[in-house]
């Protein structure tokens, strides 16, 4: 399985993202979900998710939080980080999220949009914080799969409205059945597909190529 970046960065990445959320929430007073959104819209999440050394190892957790706040709110916090020995639930949430993003190579914005919100992650703390992180991965996958099944992608919605099966769409468009399934489940990003692939799927469905793209 292809991961998001080299595993040698992983321990630092997990600790730093955990410290980032801990500092932002418990020292600076930000709402966990709100700060997760700031992390994404700031662009820091994109760089972090690609394993940019500046972000996964070069900045501490509080420094990451400061960068996020600076980019989104045009200010920097002056609150010093606390020196608590015990790890908070927010630390665990960020730590686990970093591992999940690395393991699946999904973008942070896709993870959140697919239902794995910070609220959902924090709700798992009581039962999973002492478990192996692989258990978190399993539960997180279930949450995302259920969310995607409930909501559906644009491709899935348009295909069903047309009355076409996945197999038929594969035959008509030339796209593999597996890729169509992955696009519908949002386990592959249709926005990143080759333009010719999207055009062929759109023609088979009788829609515009842009109708198949997902909002960010």
Question: At which residue positions do the language-model features occur?
Answer:
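Conserved hydrophobic/aromatic packing and binding residues within compact polymer-binding modules
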Residues: 155, 169-170, 180-184, 212
